[in-house]
Amino acid sequence: MKKFLIFIFCIFAFSTNADEKKTTFTKELFNKAQSDGKVVVVSSWLKYCSSCASQMKVLNKAKNEFDNIEYFTFDIKNKEIAELLNVQYQTTLLIFKDNKEVYRSIGETSRDAIYKAIESSI
């Protein structure tokens, strides 16, 4: 019983972290950010996904460290957005600059790798 309660706690802890500081993706916000000349970072997630929570923690920190970047997330179950961005898996990370996709990864949670991708897009 104790292990079960710990398991349930972990699920809620990860789902809470995955929802922190995110701006939900919409085509309108995405297009506006691009027309404003911002670098746009988009990540896909799935509730109760531990790697999604890990990636989101890195992105939340990056959000405070990099200026002129817009961050969006979307639930991978949203098929309309997934098809628009050609995303098939949660933890897909996309970076757009000058209206072009300049970076794509699946499952990347390393702070160094994510920061390097963002820095090279600025």
Q: What is each stretch, according to the model?
A:
Residues 4-12:
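Sec-dependent N-terminal signal peptides
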Residues 10, 17-37, 120:
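N-terminal leader/targeting and pre-domain segments
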Residues 35-47:
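Short active-site neighborhood of thiol/selenol oxidoreductases, capturing the structured segment around
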Residues 44, 49-52, 93:
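The canonical Cys-X-X-Cys-His
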Residues 44, 67-80:
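Thiol-based oxidoreductase modules, predominantly thioredoxin-like and allied folds used
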Residues 85-94:
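Structural micro-motif
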Residues 97-122:
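Non-catalytic, surface beta->alpha helical segment in thiol-disulfide oxidoreductase systems
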